[in-house]
Amino acid sequence: TPVIESTGTGGGMKLFCAGVGVNHPDITNASRVIKEGEIELCKKNGVTEIIEIVIGNDGLTLAHSLEASNADFNQEQLYLALADEVPVNGQFVKNPFQKWSEIDPSLPDHKIEVLVAPPTSGTRDAWDSLIMVKGCKAAGAYDMWSELGEKAKKKCRISREDGRVIEAGENDALIVQKLTEDPERFGYFGYSYLLVNEDKIKPTSIAGIEPTLEGIQDYSYPIARPLQFYVKKAHIGSVPGIEEFLQEFTSSRAMGEDGYLTDIGLVALSDDDAVSYTHLRAHETYT
């Protein structure tokens, strides 16, 4: 009997990379690409051949209550609202902004409060890459940290801890509930969760662009991301059912434009990007 667990991307990767054999996961889904440190952990534990399969796309959605006024933010504004330290007059200071309008008079004149995913979540990692790091660069902070090299990106990802940024766990339903309780509050999650809660919440625009299926598929929406899963090559052919599962998961009836996964929010790959199990060898293998 298949065993399915919800762990978040980071937690899933730890379990996946813990070893080979029936006591360890065969497959892990991920809302971000596997990290170098995770590849090294896999190698350390004998997981030496990992196949990556991109199954579709998703768009992070920054949402708020239907009762709220429409809002539009760019990456720089979001970084300045959420970062632990921000550049002011050429110097870094602890984030002083309490209202959005203090960042830009065109923004809402109410408190900054954003519900975010936990650090172990692939959604949080995608948000930090697509919003915090890009916003950090636009604000000039990244260049000011240039002597740190790659560590500059880590600095860009650090969120403030004064109550303006609130970790809300992996429970998207709870985030939706909290958004409906306060029209000044924002929170983010995957596009599919917006679709099933359109009677309660609405999206903000990012740099003037609202999340749509088309915008996510062609990546014109600024915070679109790929979704993928990872499978242990060593388990294919030795663990019953894996080949059949892969054939089904990558079939057009599942992940195609009219597939049943699109009915629950998956944004299908374009025809040029579409894959099937018979073409797995053309995809990235980490060894």
Which role fits each region the language model picked out?
Residues A282-T287:
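A short, hydrophobic C-terminal helix/tail in secreted or cell-surface proteins
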Residues T1-R281:
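Flexible loop/hinge segments at secondary-structure junctions
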